[in-house]
Amino acid sequence: MSCQQNQQQCQPPPKCPIPKYPPKCPSKCASSCPPPISSCCGSSSGGCGCCSSEGGGCCLSHHRHHRSHCHRPKSSNCYGSGSGQQSGGSGCCSGGGCC
């Protein structure tokens, strides 16, 4: 068998397929959490801080003009451990940010 025939038989290994939709949530919360972002619980983004019950998630207000009104983490608006996979959060940081 000639060298040219050997080169035709050799093919590069197949590449791993890239997932079309990457996972929304990280597997676990990072040790250093970022500050509140637009989709989180900062008062400037319509949120109202952290919930004090049911896992300590972040509350988001339905009413942008009434930001002091806080919803407890039984709705999908809360970035807590119970709704983290649905809403993109996995917990609340001590400084008010979401993980």
From Swiss-Prot:
GO BP terms, alphabetized: keratinization
An example Gene Ontology molecular-function term: identical protein binding
Keywords from the UniProt entry: Keratinization
Any coiled-coil regions, as ranges: none
Tissue distribution of the protein: Skin-specific. Expression was readily detected in adult trunk skin, adult arm skin, fetal skin, penal skin, vulva, esophagus and tongue. Not expressed in the cervix, rectum, lung, colon, or placenta.
Biased composition (Gly residues): 81-99
Pfam families assigned to the protein according to its UniProt record, in alphabetical order: LCE
Region Disordered, residue ranges: 78-99
Misc remark: Belongs to the LCE cluster present on 1q21.
Function text: Precursors of the cornified envelope of the stratum corneum.
Subunit structure: Interacts with CYSRT1; the interaction is direct.
Family, similarity comment: Belongs to the LCE family.
The name this protein goes by in its record: Late cornified envelope protein 4A
Gene encoding the protein: LCE4A
